Swiss-Prot record:
Protein name, UniProt field: Neurexin-1
Transmembrane segments: 1455-1475
Lineage: Eukaryota, Metazoa, Chordata, Craniata, Vertebrata
Underlying gene: Nrxn1
Domain of life of the organism encoding this protein: Eukaryota
Gene3D superfamilies: 2.60.120.200, Laminin
């Protein structure tokens, strides 16, 4: 079989018991290291961290080898002492992963003499002393000075399993070191003698007799193979070389004589039983010859329940030297082969995990040895021979008065491989037994003293013989011959038959399991099995007893059960046991056991005490309380639990049962009370799904094929893949099935009412949610009888986990109170987020999405969570709640609690204890909508609590441009306002150091009769956030951090008289008209009607919206329908018609023969400059040549626009600073006397022209378009300098875009020499209806020649409709961002009914390259854009030409421009100054100190550059009044 390894365990190796310390010292024994592969010895850990030393004596002739080694098990720190470089000692060590420090001794020590070696550790320094002649030290350059030590102190070599596990060795090169060859003795740590713990291939021997230091086995000429030839194995017995030739085919002292008749050991008889033990001529096994080749062999077959029992009571054994021989053949890994003795006087020989185990106790403690083959196992269905000898020896002590001591050497041999394993205690040399000799098994193998296994042998045993100086017991022969003292239990065949193997099975899924009969183990019992898996969790065995009620004086009845379980959690194996007086939970092994290797588990119990062992490591336990009876009444479940668990009671301590963790992996060799269980056959009988009758491990990793769909996370399991679908929104083995979504509107819930009350100590919870609210309950467990809860909720945009385990129903001291954890930020972003909670006892872990997990440890007296319900959306069980969390508005998905996907189980009807009114499917949530029917309607609520932070959320829907949505005032100047201004949302506030305005970001006005979501928040660091639908605006304010509000909170508006006293940054002059819903005030969900302190106006529940809506034909003649809350209106601007539906004739003038003219002149201080123009007019004529309308700029500028008829076709010419640009409809003849409508728009150099319903004619200048040229120009020079910039661009040859300083509109063409003759109607130009103004005798209109008004001026209703349309047109037309002049502030006071047209004109906005800068800016603008606006793109859409953009100009403009053109240098200076002054201005929000005169400074806050000399700020108010009429280019 090759070289064998001998491992030693228990508390005794080479006299290893602490009781033997004197034995080893008195004997003067050392450790002999033969230098064999696999040789090692381990001493207890030397804590060499700081100041410590160890010493030993060494004797060798070897030039290299590993002397000692220890480390921190694979991290940083280690210390190594080796022989190298001609037999010199070299020491290396490292601390904290520093560069290893090394020193090399000067003196060789491989001279065959004893040398004293001492190692002294002193923080970063280590000193090596050799004898008294040499001392060298070395220091490591480490940031840390203390060395960390985890491993034992290995001397002479390293265990093979440690060499194979490279990650467990800090110094990888130590694996390649040769083993030490020589002797080591007197190992001391800090002057105290150290005893070895275990080892292999190392012999305990006295000082070698030959002064040369060589072993007797090394004799012979140089170059020989030693004393033993032909592969014989040499060992030292009584200082003599003994050769074992049994496996060589040779015999003789040195295995030199060929002998083909040599056979195995079991059938050989002793040639001379009386031969003296003192005979120095004792040889090895090779001298044993067959006495009779035809002798009958005595063989028996054992199948797990059979055994022999020889009664020793008549003739007790009392021996000091004895021998046991037998042969075995089996496929089973574990089983008892032979046992005799009881209590502390016994011999046990067994097969343990495929190795031969020997345990001997003569009264001084157990001595154990384990023999394993190098390759494979002994359970290979081949014959193997075992021989055990125990000899009494006399040994000489050194340095003590008693020089002669007796001790016993124990030798075990398997297949002729002889190994001296050590000595028993000298004070106990006699084996005494008056009990029984058990062969092949026993009635209760687990209860035998020292038994390492719990099951009987399965296989064949041959020639089992025990002999000592006085007796020879051929046990196999006696059994077959029916000796009266030999009892045979079971049916034994006295021949070798094939024994059916216990085939392994594989549990392929967590749901698979096998039911075993009830385990009757009231007083004693044993279970053993092998398992193999790579999965971290799983319930392997479980059974419980009858439920019983445990009652104390304080609390209601509690259900308790006896139970037994073995489970895996996080790769560790646990034993759980409760016999009615308390639960024990034992970790069977400190290392993880899910590495895919086979592990043998052996559980044995006797009353309250017992052991659980994994492989060779045994852990004892003692159950608490007085009970010794384990009363199991239910079936014993293997691998998992049935799906229907209604009849089962799960103790809280069995976490895998409550977490639904079934075992996935292999099980084999299950023995219960020593009886084998054919689990493969049981699985077939029960037709269990997911159980396979074999065990193999697939080499390919399943996750390499990416089996998890929809971004599921894959983990390799045991021959399977495991998908984590928790963050995907899908379910199923491969995340292939979309998970159900539940929608909650704040009044909806889902409640799982569990059939029985649950008690758990471990939970796995995961869910996905999506919400725009910063507050709301996501999930909670609730109890009807206690305050216990595990609750997840949104709290200020974070996920808050609350776990409360109270003492109401637990006999404990007062509970500590709830534990809380927070994770995530800004989770109310209407995006899906995944939450995971893992609790294991007192350990908590909370994870949101892929962020770092938050962990915590619970305090308190217990870990049991009680609950009857799992609730979502609303908590209905509120009896023990001190405060009720806010209801949830949003969506939930994939709620999984301990493996149960409750939302989908509820939807599919798989559970019948589900109650809900939440709606399945993803739905838009509009919660509690309320309609404010009029602009004077509002409600008052309790004061908004937003002192340190704030989270507001609401939804609105309106068609109104303006309106106050929310207002709350406070102490001093503190206030908060949310309002709509020109369709855009403003958030205005004052924390005490001045008012601030933040404009919400949106691509278009929000008064589009669609629902919009608004979130406004302020955190403790004064970060303000405004989110409208998906667009976010943020700003940090300095100074005061608290919002101290005092008065009522007004929603929808305020009292009429209050508008006058609102802060200046607030535009609102009326309330909000439309719908509000889902109002969330810092976590409070008010009912706007029932919770109102008082209501005003018409407020109704629900939201029906406008009674009439815009249709395709709502407005005639291409009028534009504008949706209003109480109906709609028509914009008739570009139609030439009037009336509510654009079907009434517009104001019409007839120009008779001889010609006439209507002229409109702008006041000198009010002349507009525009980048875009819109012109529409209706006419009828038969003329081929005529001018209809002409617009001219101020004298000297030359800009113009002319609408004319040429050769019966309509066309337009214009010039805005360079060449004339013309556009014409060449396909339409319009001088046919019929009524035609022409529409013209211009944007820069681009223009469109349409006649009636003919296709629109578009004109774009050749080359780069104006917009591109404008963008290039504005990259370098902004348009703030107006005409100055135009002149600069003209010099550079670039196309201009501004129609400067418009002075007159001439209608009729008389001055141009081409008078128009015919009818003109409904003229519209950039917001002016000039013919209407002429009919109303406007002061700026002059009429000359043959011009006659037809009919009457449109009625007042028509005028109002027109005004409404004009106002709406100005607010909805697509234009550049603009800024209002300071002059509009003065004009705002004009009565609106007196001059409606003028008012509309005054509302025309000044074109600007930047966002607004004062509190009156009411135009759409991207806040915080930080750059120049694109003149042709607003809100991401390409506009059509024609938005009116107006710049006012004074009468002195012309002269000033001429002067500036002449002084180019002065222009450059002004340009640089303007760019420097305004380039870094914040455009997204505005702060105003209201203590100052804002109106007087508003012009300069526009960022305007004045074409005239600016008046000093120190001038009088009269000068300020005058300066308001200056022209500004913005």
């Amino acid at each position: 079989m090759g070289t064998a390894l001998v491992q030693h365990g228990g508390c005794c190796l080479l006299c290893l018991s602490l009781l033997l310390l004197g034995c080893w010292a008195e004997l003067g024994s050392g450790l002999e290291f033969p230098g064999a592969e696999g040789q090692w010895t381990r001493f207890p850990k030397w804590n060499a961290c700081c100041e410590s030393e160890m010493s030993f004596q060494l004797k060798t002739r070897s030039a290299r080898g590993l002397v000692l080694y220890f480390d921190d098990e694979g991290f940083c720190d280690f210390l190594e002492l080796i022989l190298t470089r001609g037999g010199r000692l070299q020491l290396s060590f490292s601390i904290f992963c520093a560069e290893p420090a090394t020193l090399l001794a000067d003196t060789p020590v491989n001279d065959g003499a004893w040398h004293s070696v001492r190692i002294r550790r002193q923080f970063r320094n280590t000193t090596l002393y050799i004898d008294r002649a040499e001392a060298k030290w070395v220091e490591v350059k480490s940031k840390r000075r203390d060395m960390t030590v985890f491993s034992g102190l290995f001397v002479g070599g390293l265990p093979p399993e440690l060499r194979a596990a490279a990650l467990k060795l800090t110094l990888a090169s130590v694996r390649e070191r040769e083993p030490f060859k020589g002797w080591i003795r007197d190992v001391r740590v800090n002057s105290s003698q150290a005893l070895p713990v275990d080892g292999s291939e190392v012999k305990l021997d006295e000082e070698p007799p030959n002064s040369g230091g060589g072993s007797p086995c090394e004799a012979g000429d140089e170059g020989d193979g030693g004393v033993c030839l032909n592969g014989g194995v040499c060992s030292v017995v009584d200082d003599q070389a003994v050769c074992d030739c049994s496996r060589t085919g040779f015999r003789g002292k040195d295995c030199s004589q060929e002998d083909n008749n040599v056979e195995g050991l079991a059938h050989l008889m002793m040639g001379d039983q009386g031969k003296s033990k003192e005979d120095n001529n004792v040889e090895g096994l090779a001298h044993l010859m067959m006495g009779d080749q035809g002798k009958e062999e005595y063989i028996a077959t054992f199948k797990g329940s059979e055994y022999f029992c020889y009664d020793l009571s008549q003739n007790p054994i009392q021996s000091s030297s004895d021998e046991i021989t037998l042969s075995f053949k089996t496929l089973q890994r574990n089983g008892l082969m032979l046992h005799t003795g009881k209590s502390a006087d016994y011999v046990n020989l067994a097969l343990k995990n495929g190795a031969v185990s020997l345990v001997i106790n003569l009264g001084s403690g157990a001595f154990e040895a384990l023999v394993e083959p190098v390759n494979g196992k002994f359970n290979d269905n081949a014959w193997h021979d075992v021989k055990v000898t125990r000899n009494l020896r006399q040994h000489s002590g050194i340095g003590h008065a008693m020089v002669n001591k007796l001790h016993c050497s124990v030798t075990i041999s398997v297949d002729g491989i002889l190994t001296t394993t050590g000595y028993t205690q000298e004070d106990y040399t006699m084996l005494g037994s008056d009990d029984f000799f058990y062969v092949g098994g026993s009635p209760s193998t687990a209860d035998l003293p020292g038994s390492p296994v719990s099951n009987n042998f399965m296989g064949c045993l041959k020639e089992v013989v025990y002999k000592n100086n006085d007796v020879r017991l051929e046990l196999s022969r006696l059994a077959k011959q029916g000796d009266p003292k030999m009892k045979i239990h079971g049916v034994v065949a006295f021949k070798c038959e094939n024994v059916a193997t216990l085939d392994p099975i594989t549990f392929e899924t967590p749901e698979s399991f096998i039911s075993l009969p009830k385990w009757n183990a009231k007083k004693t019992g044993s279970i053993s099995f092998d398992f193999r898996t790579t999965e971290p969790n799983g319930l392997i065995l479980f059974s419980h007893g009858k439920p019983r009620h445990q009652k104390d004086a304080k609390h209601p009845q509690m259900i308790k059960v006896d139970f037994f379980a073995i489970e895996m959690l996080d790769g560790h194996l646990y034993l759980l046991l409760d016999m009615g007086s308390g639960t024990i939970k034992i970790k069977a092994l400190q290392k993880k056991v899910n590495d895919g290797e086979w592990y043998h588990v052996d559980f044995q119990r006797d009353g309250r005490s017992g052991t659980i062992s994994v492989n060779t490591l045994r852990t004892p336990y003692t159950a608490p309380g007085e009970s010794e009876i384990l009363d199991l009444d239910d079936e014993l479940y293997l691998g998992g639990l049935p799906e229907n668990k209604a009849g089962l009671v799960f103790p809280t301590e069995v976490w895998t049962a409550l977490l639904n963790y079934g075992y996935v992996g292999c099980i084999r060799d299950l023995f219960i009370d020593g009886q084998s269980k054919d689990i493969r056959q049981m699985a077939e009988i029960q037709s269990t799904a997911g159980v396979k009758p074999s065990c193999s491990r697939e080499t390919a990793k399943p996750c390499l094929s990416n089996p998890c769909k929809n971004n599921g996370m894959c983990r390799d399991g045991w021959n399977r893949y495991v998908c984590d679908c928790s963050g995907t929104g899908y379910l199923g083995r491969s995340c292939e099935r979309e998970a159900t979504v539940l929608s909650y509107d704040g009044s909806m819930f889902m409640k799982i009412q569990l059939p029985v009350v649950m008690h758990t100590e471990a939970e796995d919870v995961s869910l996905r949610f999506r919400s725009q609210r910063a507050y709301g309950i996501l999930m909670a467990t609730t109890s009807r009888d206690s305050a216990d809860t595990l609750r997840l909720e949104l709290d200020a945009g974070r996920v808050k986990l609350t776990v409360n385990l109270d003492c109401i129903r637990i006999n404990c001291n007062s509970s500590k109170g709830p534990e809380t954890l927070f994770a995530g930020y800004n989770l109310n972003d209407n995006e899906w987020h995944t939450v995971r909670v893992v609790r294991r006892g007192k350990s908590l872990k909370l994870t949101v999405d892929d962020q770092q997990a938050m962990t915590g440890q619970m305090a308190g007296d217990h870990t049991r969570l009680e609950f009857h319900n799992i609730e979502t959306g609303i908590i209905t069980e509120r009896r023990y709640l001190s405060s009720v969390p806010s209801n949830f508005i949003g969506h939930l998905q994939s709620l999984t609690f301990n493996g149960m996907a409750y939302i989908d189980l509820c939807k599919n009807g798989d559970i019948d204890y589900c109650e809900l009114n939440a709606r399945f499917g993803f739905r838009n949530i509009i919660a509690d909508p309320v309609t404010f029917k009029t602009k004077s309607s509002y409600v008052a609520l309790a004061t908004l609590q937003a002192y340190t932070s704030m989270h507001l959320f609401f939804q609105f829907k309106t068609t109104s441009l303006d309106g106050l949505i929310l207002y709350n005032s406070g102490d001093g100047n503190d206030f908060i306002v949310v309002e709509l201004v020109k369709g855009y949302l403003h958030y205005v506030f004052d924390l005490g150091n001045g008012a601030n305005l933040i404009k919400g970001s949106s691509n278009k006005p929000l008064n589009d009769n669609q629902w919009h979501n608004v979130m406004i928040s302020r955190d403790t660091s004064n970060l303000h956030t405004v989110k409208i639908d998906t667009k976010i605006t943020t700003q940090i304010t300095a100074g005061a951090r608290n919002l101290d509000l005092k008065s009522d909170l007004y929603i929808g508006g305020v009292a009429k008289e209050t508008y006058k006293s609102l802060p200046k940054l607030v535009h609102a002059k009326e309330g909000f008209q439309g719908c509000l819903a889902s109002v969330d005030l810092n976590g409070r969900l008010p009912d706007l009607i029932s919770d109102a302190l008082f209501c005003n106006g018409q407020i109704e529940r629900g939201c029906e919206g406008p009674s009439t809506t815009c249709q395709e034909d709502s407005c005639s003649n291409q009028g534009v329908c504008l949706q209003q809350w109480d109906g709609f209106s028509c914009d008739c601007s570009m139609t030439s018609f009037s009336g509510p539906l654009c079907n009434d004739p517009g104001t019409t003038y007839i120009f008779s023969k001889g010609g006439g003219q209507i002229t409109h002149k702008w006041p000198p201080n009010d002349r507009p400059s525009t980048r875009a123009d819109r012109l529409a007019i209706g006419f009828s004529t038969v003329q081929k040549e005529a001018v209809l309308v002409r617009v001219d700029s101020s004298s000297g500028l030359g800009d113009y626009l002319e609408l004319h008829i040429h050769q019966g076709k309509i066309g337009v010419k214009f010039n805005v600073g360079t060449d004339d640009i013309a556009i014409e409809e060449s396909n339409a003849i319009i001088n046919d006397g019929k009524y035609h409508v022409v529409r013209f728009t211009r944007s820069g150099g681009n223009a469109t022209l349409q006649v009636d319903s003919w296709p629109v004619i578009e004109r774009y200048p050749a080359g780069n378009n104006d917009n591109e040229r404008l963008a290039i120009a504005r990259q370098r020079i902004p348009y703030r300098l107006g005409r100055v910039v135009d002149e600069w661009l003209l010099d550079k040859g670039r196309q201009l875009t501004i129609f400067n300083s418009q002075a007159t509109i001439i209608i009729g063409g008389k001055e141009q020499g081409q008078p128009f003759q015919g009818q003109l109607s409904g003229l519209y130009y950039n917001g002016l209806k000039v013919l209407n103004m002429a009919a109303e005798n406007d002061a700026n209109i002059a009429i000359v020649g043959n011009v006659r008004l037809v009919g009457e001026v449109p009625s007042s209703m028509t005028t109002e409709s027109t005004a409404t349309a004009m106002q709406s047109e100005m607010s909805t037309s697509i234009m550049e961002t603009t800024t209002t002049l300071a002059t509009s502030t003065a004009r705002r006071g004009k009565p609106p009914t007196k001059e409606p047209i003028s008012q509309t004109t005054d509302d025309i906005l000044v074109a600007s390259a930047e966002c607004p800068s004062d509190d009156e800016d009411i135009d759409p603008c991207e806040p915080s854009s930080g750059g120049l606006a694109n003149p042709t793109r607003v809100g991401g859409r390409e506009p059509y030409p024609g938005s009116a953009e107006v710049i006012r100009e004074s009468s002195s403009t012309t002269g000033m421009v001429v002067g500036i053109v002449a002084a180019a240098a002065l222009c450059i200076l002004i340009l640089l100054y303007a760019m420097y002054k305004y380039r870094n201005r914040d455009e997204g929000s505005y702060h105003v100190d209201e203590s100052r005169n804002y109106i007087s400074n508003s012009a300069q806050s526009n960022g305007a550059v004045v074409k005239e000399k600016q008046p000093s700020s120190a001038k009088s108010a009269n000068k300020n009044k005058k300066n308001k009429d200056k022209e500004y280019y913005v």
